[in-house]
C-alpha cells in the first residue's frame, strides 16, 4: 500500500515514477517509428492504457480481466472516422518474468487477444528507449499483415 501511495503522491507532484517515464519514452519511440514506417500518412494512431473491454466488443473468454484489465498500448488503424484496433503492445518489466500473478494475467491477456484474432506484442522494459528495436518490431508486424 505504501508503494501505491508513493506512486500517486509522485504523480500528484508532477514527478513521474520510473515506469511512467519508461512508458512515455516507449510511446514517443513507438509513435516516431510508426510515422517513419508509414511516411506520415497518418494511417495509424496509438492509444495508451486502453481498457480491454474498449478494444473488443464481446467477452469470448468471460474473464474478469476482460472488464478490469488494460493494454499498455493499442495501435489503431484509421478508417474514415473510425479507429479499428489492430495491435496490442505490452511493456513488460521484471515482474512479468518473476511474479506468478502477473504471469497469469499476461496469459489471460494473450488468450483474449488470440480469441479475438488480434496480435499482442510484448516488449521488455529495457528496450523501451531503443528506437531501432521498436521500429524493427513494427516493421516485422506490418510486413506480416500487409
What role is predicted for each listed range?
Residues 1-146:
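Nucleic-acid endo/exonuclease domains
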Amino acid at each position: 500500500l505504501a508503494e501505491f501511495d508513493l506512486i500517486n503522491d509522485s504523480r500528484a507532484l508532477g514527478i513521474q515514477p520510473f515506469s511512467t517515464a519508461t512508458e512515455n519514452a516507449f510511446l514517443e519511440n513507438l509513435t516516431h517509428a510508426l510515422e517513419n514506417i508509414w511516411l506520415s500518412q497518418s494511417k495509424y494512431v496509438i492509444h495508451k492504457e486502453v481498457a480491454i473491454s474498449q478494444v473488443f466488443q464481446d467477452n469470448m473468454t468471460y474473464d474478469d480481466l476482460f472488464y478490469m484489465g488494460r493494454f499498455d498500448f493499442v495501435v489503431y488503424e484509421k478508417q474514415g472516422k473510425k479507429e479499428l484496433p489492430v495491435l496490442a503492445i505490452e511493456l513488460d518489466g521484471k515482474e512479468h518474468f518473476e511474479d506468478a500473478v502477473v504471469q497469469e494475467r499476461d496469459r489471460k491477456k494473450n488468450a483474449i487477444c488470440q480469441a479475438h484474432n488480434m496480435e499482442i506484442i510484448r516488449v521488455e522494459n529495457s528496450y523501451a528507449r531503443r528506437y531501432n528495436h521498436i521500429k524493427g518490431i513494427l516493421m516485422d508486424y506490418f510486413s506480416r499483415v500487409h
